[in-house]
Amino acid sequence: MNAEKSPVTPNVDHEEIAKFEAVASRWWDLEGEFKPLHRINPLRLGYIAERAGGLFGKKVLDVGCGGGILAESMAREGATVTGLDMGFEPLQVAKLHALESGIQVNYVQETVEEHAAKHAGQYDVVTCMEMLEHVPDPQSVVRACAQLVKPGGDVFFSTLNRNGKSWLMAVVGAEYILRMVPKGTHDVKKFIKPAELLGWVDQTSLKERHMTGLHYNPITNTFKLGPGVDVNYMLHTQNK
């Protein structure tokens, strides 16, 4: 799974792209398929801004930006934001929403590996949220993110742990019982253990700074960040 990719073999899962293309028009529907992303975005944004020492005036790259929920919110914080995605329809939605909102975001359709070949060391902050589990070679994405950030810059990852609890919560619970996301959104075999992600990070110039869990309470229908990384988790790293 972690073999080196040649320049002519993009790190893309076309089935995964198709899933998100099919529902792209509803990306900004606060009650639609992406409702959970809208709900957790303030937590993500707050964590990123706090750990990075603010976003104002910084050059930020959002890898796997989709319809632009996080990218747009970081631009509102005063960052100069580029959003990368390989899905044409989500990017069209992102561009239109930014235009309607009067927000400047530069959206680009290319892989992070392609972007790294042209823009190495150009970003103060790189974010990669819930994207690693949707590509054939997540380690390649981690390497590219490390190449893109400036010395001393910050890189943030979020993904899902691979264990019985995460399968129960993220697949059975979220997709089939609570129907928070469309069925088939997640494949537990592609989930990533924190030790695996940290192992990939250790093979780059990045250094782990902080890790936190993202927790959902079905009784109160609320999300929060806190200790425990057995389901969703976020990782803050910094370039050496």
UniProtKB/Swiss-Prot annotation:
Highest taxon of source: Bacteria
Record carries keyword Cytoplasm: no
SUPFAM superfamilies noted in UniProt: S-adenosyl-L-methionine-dependent methyltransferases
Residues where S-adenosyl-L-methionine binds: 44, 64, 85, 129
Enzyme class at the top of the EC tree: transferase
Reactions that this protein is recorded to catalyse: a 3-demethylubiquinol + S-adenosyl-L-methionine = a ubiquinol + S-adenosyl-L-homocysteine + H(+); a 3-(all-trans-polyprenyl)benzene-1,2-diol + S-adenosyl-L-methionine = a 2-methoxy-6-(all-trans-polyprenyl)phenol + S-adenosyl-L-homocysteine + H(+)
GO terms (BP aspect): methylation
Alphabetized InterPro entries for the sequence: SAM-dependent_MTases_sf (IPR029063), UbiG_MeTrfase (IPR010233)
UniProt keywords, alphabetically: Methyltransferase, S-adenosyl-L-methionine, Transferase, Ubiquinone biosynthesis
Pathway: Cofactor biosynthesis; ubiquinone biosynthesis
Molecular-function annotations in GO: 2-polyprenyl-6-hydroxyphenol methylase activity; 3-demethylubiquinol 3-O-methyltransferase activity; polyprenyldihydroxybenzoate methyltransferase activity
Enzyme Commission code(s) on record: 2.1.1.222, 2.1.1.64
Family the UniProt entry places it in: Belongs to the methyltransferase superfamily. UbiG/COQ3 family.
PANTHER family for the chain: METHYLTRANSFERASE, UBIQUINONE BIOSYNTHESIS O-METHYLTRANSFERASE, MITOCHONDRIAL
Protein function: O-methyltransferase that catalyzes the 2 O-methylation steps in the ubiquinone biosynthetic pathway.
Name of this chain's protein: Ubiquinone biosynthesis O-methyltransferase
Organism of derivation: Escherichia fergusonii (strain ATCC 35469 / DSM 13698 / CCUG 18766 / IAM 14443 / JCM 21226 / LMG 7866 / NBRC 102419 / NCTC 12128 / CDC 0568-73)
Record gene name: ubiG
